[in-house]
């Protein structure tokens, strides 16, 4: 096991489980037998899904992966029914419960649940430990289960490995755009070697990270409990986010992050919490994996701290402030420095690692990720994939996770919170929609009268 993978394994805590949780909602009832066969066949190329973690018996030794000689797919697939009335609230409760439940550490660290009774369709919920891979790899794994058509057969990838034809069409472009909001910050993962030579700049950035003051105390920070809450929005039109970006010379990423920041401000205001002059930081993943290694599992990403200017009242000023911050981070080797810190933490004794987590965790309030997903609808086990949402773990002592995902022309927001800190994350989701509509209204006033070229202009905006 690599030192960075070991670092994520060591972050596991009963109050903050290191799982990536994904929810895929289907337009009809899926067949459990077909799903098991699909999982068994398409996860087979990823050997890590057939390996369990063996923890060291001697102090100072690294954990390692060991093949599960008696691997049985049935140990990793559950078929359950959603409690009545089978609505969004019932699904949110179930997702929250499973997100709060640890994986079985005696087996490979992943599990898939087929949930029936959600309206007229099924839901596939996947829980995968972060030590297996980072977000870019795990999104690839989850979408490798999908197809471009209801009856598509698996396409060949790298010799005898199989994956989805729908995924093959989408993955290279997604990796090129950057699979997460931070991963867009590093325009070319191949720059890793160039940045690695910038020793002086790296030392400066490390000093900057160490010198950052702790994030201010807000309702989003505090002692964590074991119960988490997971919620998500309905899809919002991606083209509208593009038009907002066009109006203010910003990328879609800039607009999405600004909208999320405005939602947090609105939430604090409704709780009568102070916002004047308040800025918080989000820990943002940055992809460091070269494009020709996008198929590999493992953790190959760094983290940057992105300032979210909650205290700015004007939504346009917030957007411009975030754009400037993200533009600055694009030219920074901060993600590589953070990757190096994670590498060292993974090699350190557990006590030292936990001290490091506590130290760096105090400097942020949230984890923020944004995945530009497939632009066309996909199918899973013969059923159309209506919507997708995921949540990454909140590393260290963070209790707020913000996930943004685009799929088939829509954008959804997912929020995961510690129930003891924020028991009503659905209010943040509502505020996201309100902030989006406010930005859209301002952009409409600024834009020229609508023309036939508006949709073309929207498509021209970059991530």
Locate the predicted segments by residue.
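Soluble acyl-CoA-dependent acyltransferase catalytic core bearing the H(X)4D motif
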Residues: 1-4, 11-14, 19-398, 402-463
């Amino acid at each position: 096991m690599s030192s960075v993978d070991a670092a994520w394994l060591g972050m596991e805590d009963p109050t903050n489980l290191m799982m990536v949780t994904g929810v895929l909602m289907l337009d009809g009832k899926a067949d459990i037998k077909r799903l098991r066969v699909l999982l068994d066949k398409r996860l087979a190329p990823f050997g890590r899904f057939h390996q369990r973690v063996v923890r060291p018996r001697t102090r100072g030794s690294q954990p390692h992966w060991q093949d599960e000689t008696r691997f049985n797919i049935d140990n990793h697939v559950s078929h359950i029914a959603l409690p009545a009335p089978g609505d969004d609230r019932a699904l949110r409760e179930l997702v929250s419960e499973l997100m709060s439940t640890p994986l079985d550490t005696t087996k490979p660290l992943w599990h898939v649940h087929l949930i029936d009774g959600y309206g007229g369709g099924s839901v596939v919920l996947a829980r995968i430990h972060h030590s297996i891979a980072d977000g870019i790899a795990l999104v690839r794994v989850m979408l490798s289960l999908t197809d471009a058509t209801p009856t598509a057969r698996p396409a060949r990838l790298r010799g005898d490995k199989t994956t989805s034809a729908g995924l093959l069409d989408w993955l290279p472009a997604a990796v090129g755009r950057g699979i997460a909001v931070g991963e867009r910050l590093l325009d070319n993962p191949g720059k890793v070697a160039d940045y690695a030579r910038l020793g002086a700049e790296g030392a400066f950035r490390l000093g900057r990270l160490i010198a950052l003051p702790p994030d201010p105390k807000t309702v989003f920070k505090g002692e964590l409990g074991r119960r988490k809450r997971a919620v998500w929005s309905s899809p919002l039109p991606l083209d509208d986010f593009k038009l907002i970006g066009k109006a203010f010379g910003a990328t879609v990423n800039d607009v999405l992050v600004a909208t999320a920041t405005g939602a947090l401000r609105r939430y604090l205001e409704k709780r009568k919490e102070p916002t004047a002059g308040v800025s918080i930081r989000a820990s943002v993943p940055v992809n460091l994996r070269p494009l020709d290694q996008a198929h590999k599992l493992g953790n190959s990403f760094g983290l940057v701290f992105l300032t979210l200017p909650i205290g700015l009242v004007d939504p346009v000023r917030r957007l411009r402030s975030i754009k400037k911050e993200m533009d600055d981070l694009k030219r920074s080797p901060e993600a590589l420095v953070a990757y190096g810190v994670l590498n060292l933490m993974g090699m350190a004794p557990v006590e030292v690692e936990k001290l490091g987590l506590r130290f760096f965790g105090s400097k942020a309030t949230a984890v923020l990720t944004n995945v530009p997903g497939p632009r066309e609808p996909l199918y899973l086990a013969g059923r159309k994939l209506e919507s997708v949402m995921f949540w990454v773990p909140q590393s260290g002592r963070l209790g707020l996770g913000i996930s943004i995902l685009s799929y088939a022309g829509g954008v959804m927001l997912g929020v995961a919170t510690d129930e003891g800190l924020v028991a009503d994350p659905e209010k943040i989701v509502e505020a996201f929609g309100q902030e989006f509509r406010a930005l859209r209204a301002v952009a409409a006033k600024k834009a020229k009268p609508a023309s036939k070229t508006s949709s073309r202009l929207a498509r021209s905006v970059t991530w």
